[in-house]
């Protein structure tokens, strides 16, 4: 599948549809597995998450899937949208713990599936390969399998060695944020990719918000292209990753992160979130590009 999609660098305009944030947010059903792209405090789909939280009613009983989860994910946890979490890290990097996730984890308000970088990588690889599991020596000799009874062991038929069989990870909806999208449906990301490319090829539905609309994506050494038809829907969302960074357009808004942490630690999450949601998203000119 990877090689097939990679070969289609400039596709058919009919393959991908440009929509607005409100329409995109309506595509996330209750109870689904929602993956959010980016890494820690870099290029997270914050504008999409805020629009999701403007929905009435808000989505519920979601399983959050992130290689690393951060600010945008903490908003969803604090708003009561998340039932289960699958990630190997949930925090705000140098700005500390993710306060709403930490509180929910401490009170038992979330189902947390124990994950490591290896377990997520193997589960994603299995899904991309179309197989039920991916064998690995990761977790051998640790107590981690005791925390995940769904993770089984297999015997290597060639060596007789016992291996961990990490099950394939399913994903209903993946949302990424990129630099540019064109009318053909191609998307340009910067090179701090995380597992964004893998999310494109393992998820049932892919939505990408972008900083800019261009006539035709141009290749460059400091960026990567998600070729059409990797994303089913594109959304024009300028500054859509703020307050996380979107290199080279803007840096991490450190003061906003500190304001968020202070608000949550002082019991002010609802007031903080309410202030964010009252701000209208930027004009979505991309909705007219379909």
PLM-predicted stretches and their roles:
Residues 2-3:
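Tryptophan (W) side chains
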Residues 14-290:
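Conserved alpha/beta enzyme-core scaffold
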